[in-house]
């Protein structure tokens, strides 16, 4: 129930889906619940939603710490650490609790969906659904079918994401997919400019935001994403 999970949950719950937010850590669940309350209260203050809508959204989400609580889910979206073996283990375990029709999706930003699917008894139900941070605000969502993914699962996933009023880009199951593949030079060339003492961090960020019209500079973005995650993606 970290940043991405909470963000994805906010997308789901505002579309009248019943949402279950899972984490083994009860403290993390409590933190997510408080963050949602803060976000919704701000939306009420700005008159984006009213108190009735706030209550409806809050009632749509439950916080669980046992995988068996996900048993009646139509769609499960995983957003844990970017480690292939950890994800494979989770997906394999999930199959013990969910129905055969449940779609299992990974929010991975770069790992092979086919490799994750290979850990499952029903690999055809596995697909990539890659949101961008912050998920409630970013419109683009990459949908990545593995070689094993069924056409029905792909079609259902595209419809679901579209119903959430997001823009779907279907990507090939290749490292980095679309956006993170394109972003590699954005980071690497910025690092090279710094390494060659052409400009410092702040100047590079300033130039790309002011002249290039990027919302965030490369170093600001790397700090936000986390260098550990960026390294794995690269």
Language model features: what each stretch is:
Residues 1-234:
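N-terminal glycine-rich phosphate-binding loop for ADP-containing cofactors
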């Amino acid at each position: 129930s970290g940043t991405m999970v909470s963000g994805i949950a906010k997308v789901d719950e505002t579309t009248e889906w019943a949402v279950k937010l899972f984490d083994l850590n009860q403290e993390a669940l409590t933190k997510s619940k408080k963050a949602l309350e803060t976000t919704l209260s701000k939306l009420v203050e700005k008159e984006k939603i009213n108190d009735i809508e706030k209550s409806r959204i809050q009632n749509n989400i439950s916080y669980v710490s046992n995988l068996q609580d996900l048993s009646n889910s139509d769609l499960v979206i995983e957003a844990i650490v970017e480690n292939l073996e950890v994800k494979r283990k989770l997906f394999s375990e999930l199959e013990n609790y969910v129905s055969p029709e449940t779609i299992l999706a990974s929010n991975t930003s770069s790992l092979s969906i086919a490799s994750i699917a290979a850990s499952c008894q029903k690999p055809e139900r596995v697909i990539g659904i890659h949101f961008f941070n912050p998920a409630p605000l970013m419109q683009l969502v990459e949908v990545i079918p593995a070689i094993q993914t069924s056409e029905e699962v792909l079609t259902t996933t595209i419809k679901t994401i579209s119903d959430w009023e997001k823009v779907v880009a279907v990507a090939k199951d290749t490292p980095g997919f679309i956006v993170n593949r394109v972003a590699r030079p954005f980071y690497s060339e910025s690092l090279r400019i710094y390494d060659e003492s052409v400009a410092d961090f702040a100047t590079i960020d300033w130039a790309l935001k002011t002249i290039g019209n990027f919302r965030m500079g490369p170093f600001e973005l790397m700090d936000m994403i986390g260098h550990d995650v960026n390294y794995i993606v690269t």
